[in-house]
C-alpha cells in the first residue's frame, strides 16, 4: 500500500492511498486523486503505477507538464519512494503506507 501526499499547493496535506495505480487530475470523473483547485492541472494529468517494487510516473500529455527533479517527465519514468514531483503547481510525493 502506498500513500500519495500533497506537500504544497491548494490541497496541502491531502492524501490518497493506492495499491497498484492512481490517476492524478482535475476532473473527479477521470482522476482518483483530484486536484480540482489547481487550475494548472489537466483533467487527466498523470498516472502512478506500481511495477513490482518500483513506482512508474507517467505524464498523460498534460498541458502544463509533470516535473521530477526539476526535469519534465516525458513518457514513463521511475519514481523513487519519497521523491517529490510537481503536477501543475502542486508538489506531491509517494510514501509507503
Q: What role is predicted for each listed range?
A:
Residues 1-6, 12-13, 53, 88-97:
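Regulatory inter-domain linker segments that are low-complexity and enriched
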Residues 14-90:
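Forkhead-associated
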Amino acid at each position: 500500500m502506498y500513500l500519495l501526499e500533497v506537500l504544497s499547493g491548494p490541497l496541502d496535506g491531502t492524501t490518497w492511498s493506492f495499491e497498484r495505480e492512481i490517476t492524478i487530475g482535475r476532473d473527479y470523473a477521470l482522476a482518483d486523486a483530484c486536484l480540482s483547485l489547481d487550475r494548472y492541472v489537466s483533467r487527466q494529468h498523470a498516472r502512478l503505477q506500481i511495477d513490482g517494487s518500483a513506482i512508474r510516473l507517467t505524464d498523460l500529455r498534460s498541458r502544463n507538464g509533470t516535473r521530477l527533479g526539476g526535469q519534465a517527465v516525458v513518457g514513463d519514468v521511475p519514481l523513487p519512494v519519497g521523491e517529490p514531483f510537481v503536477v501543475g503547481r502542486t508538489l506531491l510525493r509517494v510514501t509507503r503506507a
